[in-house]
């Protein structure tokens, strides 16, 4: 399948100047400092994975549990109206960190390890309809899919077909090599 003109973009570090999930985390901790208790365990899982001391499955489990705890705590916080409102307020403040070179087209695909709950709002504001992200069930605050590492290419193929060819892929990371391999042109 050739997707003529298909443009796929990594989000954090590529379109967004920084790591949006980390920025949201710090932003939310300003509203409820209890959120700080979740950063060390998440970083520990990420470092172990990067050093080869944890499998993708272990990282998925650990990050999933910590994210669920963090989002549940925020959703119950008396200091936060709702997680959705917090995300909306976050983008009111941080939307300017979308890099000016990015000129969105409605059929672009944003591919990210960050959560649909957070990046979905940025996509809405950008006018981009296609988001492939880690997924959170907002009813339970459970992570239902972690779109990280090899999961990115796996999920992308599930959604767009096993033989899809990307015309242009934009990323800031060599960890996206499986996506780079699917593209006619890749830009870092």
PLM features: what roles do these ranges have?
Residues 59-98:
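Metal-dependent phosphoesterase signature
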Residues 2, 83-188:
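C-terminal cap/substrate-recognition subdomain and adjoining C-terminal extension
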Residues 45-73, 123-126, 130-131:
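Short, compositionally biased "basic patch" segments
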Residues 1-54:
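Active-site neighborhood of HAD-like aspartate-dependent phosphohydrolases
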Residues 12, 51-54, 71-78, 90, ...:
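A general boundary/transition motif marking the beginning of the first structured unit of a protein
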Residues 33-36, 41-48, 63, 103, ...:
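Solvent-exposed, non-transmembrane amphipathic alpha-helical segments
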Residues 30-31, 49, 53, 69, ...:
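A structural signal for alpha-helix termini and helix-coil/disorder junctions
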């Amino acid at each position: 399948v050739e997707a003529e003109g298909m443009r796929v973009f990594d989000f954090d570090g590529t379109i967004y100047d920084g790591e949006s999930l980390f920025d949201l985390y710090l932003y939310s901790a300003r509203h409820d400092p209890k959120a700080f208790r979740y950063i060390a365990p998440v970083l520990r899982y990420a470092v172990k994975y990067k050093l080869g001391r944890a499998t993708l499955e272990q990282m998925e489990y650990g990050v999933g549990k910590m994210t669920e705890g963090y989002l549940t705590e925020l959703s119950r916080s008396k200091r936060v109206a709702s997680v959705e409102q917090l995300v909306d307020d976050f983008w009111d403040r941080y939307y300017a960190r979308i890099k000016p070179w990015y000129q969105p087209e409605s059929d672009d695909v944003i591919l990210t390890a960050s959560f649909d709950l957070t990046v979905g709002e940025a996509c809405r504001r950008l006018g981009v309809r296609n988001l492939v992200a880690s997924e959170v069930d907002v009813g339970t605050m459970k992570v239902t899919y972690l779109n990280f590492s090899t999961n990115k290419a796996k999920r992308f193929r599930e959604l767009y077909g096993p033989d899809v060819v990307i015309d242009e892929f934009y990323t800031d990371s060599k960890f996206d090599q499986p996506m780079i391999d699917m593209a006619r042109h890749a830009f870092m």
